[in-house]
Structures are given as C-alpha cells and as structure tokens.
Regions:
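Conserved catalytic cores of phosphodiester-cleaving nucleases, focusing on short active-site segments
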Residues: 37-72
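Acidic-basic catalytic patches of nuclease active cores, encompassing PD-(D/E)XK
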Residues: 1-44, 56
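Nucleic-acid nuclease catalytic cores
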Residues: 81-108
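Electrostatic, structured charged patches in enzyme active sites and in nucleic-acid/phosphate-binding
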Residues: 71, 76, 84-89, 103, ...
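Short secondary-structure capping micro-motifs at structural edges
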Residues: 33-37, 70-83, 93-94
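Short loop/turn segments at secondary-structure transitions that flank enzyme active sites
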Residues: 54, 97-99, 114
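Non-catalytic C-terminal interaction segments of nucleic acid-processing enzymes
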Residues: 103-155
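Positively charged, aromatic-accented nucleic-acid-binding surfaces
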Residues: 10, 20-27, 31, 79, ...
Length: 155
C-alpha cells in the first residue's frame, strides 16, 4: 500500500475546494515544499503555486497566529519566470493548524507577488488576528503596514 505524505493533505484540500467550484487542474510540477498547478477555466488559464505550513510558528498575547513561508532560489526563479512571461499567476499559502479543520489558506495575486519579489523577500510571514477577516502579509514595517488580503479571496 502506498503511504501518503503530509503535503498530500494540504495540497489535496486546496484542490478539492477548486474542484468543488468546477475548476479542474493539471499538475505541472511537484516537489517536497511546493506544487505548481495549471488550470483552464472559462475565464482563462492560470497557474497556482502552492506552499503550506502545517502549524503556526507563533501564537502571541496579541491574539495573532503567524506562519512563515520560505522560498528557495528555485521557487523565486520560477515565480519571476511566470511574471516575466505575463502568466496569470496566483500563490496559495496554506496556513495549517493542529486541528486540520481549522486550517485556512490565503491567495496572493500576481501584483502582490511582484511587490514581494521587488522587495527582495525570500520568505513571507502571514498572520491573522482572531476576529479579523483579513490576513496580513508583512512587506516591511511590521503588521501595521502589512498588505491586507481578504480571507474570502478566490484564486
């Protein structure tokens, strides 16, 4: 019997969500820390670059939970390539929790990815406060100056 990897649960949850919304993927590239999917929809083609963290890195007294996503040199090269080729690109970051049912994901669109790459970021910290409906993506200057990404955003 084939065994499943931890990443199968996280990537599978995102793919299941998309399929339930009538969006069918084709796997383009698979690796230990990321997966890249290509989608064809009635609104056009797009690439989805997925990464996950299985648990938050911190839970502090301010009520924030944070996940840090590191990008390898290969990841950054691939993202830059997609942007240069003017591909429709989304980056999905799966924010796992110890109770899998409490896990969430956020989606960065190409313009936001371009901003992060332009800032020389090799990692992205995603945080959310307990009662908020937006993720914070730190670009520089801490949480107060962070990009605010709605939790209900589509790919």
């Amino acid at each position: 019997m084939a065994s499943m990897k931890e990443s199968d649960f996280y990537y599978g949850a995102v793919i299941s969500t998309l399929i339930n919304n009538k969006i069918c993927p084709a796997l383009v590239e698979s690796g230990k820390d990321r997966q890249i999917y290509e989608f064809t929809t009635d609104q056009g083609d797009f690439k989805l670059f997925l990464k996950y963290r299985s648990a938050p890195k911190t839970k502090n007294e301010d009520g924030y939970r944070s996940w840090q996503f590191n990008f390898t040199e290969s990841d950054l090269k691939r993202l830059c390539q997609y942007i240069e080729e003017n591909k429709h690109l989304s980056v999905g970051l799966v924010c796992g929790e110890n109770k899998l049912g409490n896990s969430m994901y956020t989606v960065l669109h190409k313009e936001e990815v371009r901003l992060l790459l332009g800032a020389g970021k090799e990692s992205v910290t995603v945080s959310i406060k307990k009662s908020e409906k937006k993720f914070r993506i730190e670009v520089g200057g801490g949480r107060k100056k962070a990009m605010m990404i709605p939790t209900s955003r589509n790919f």
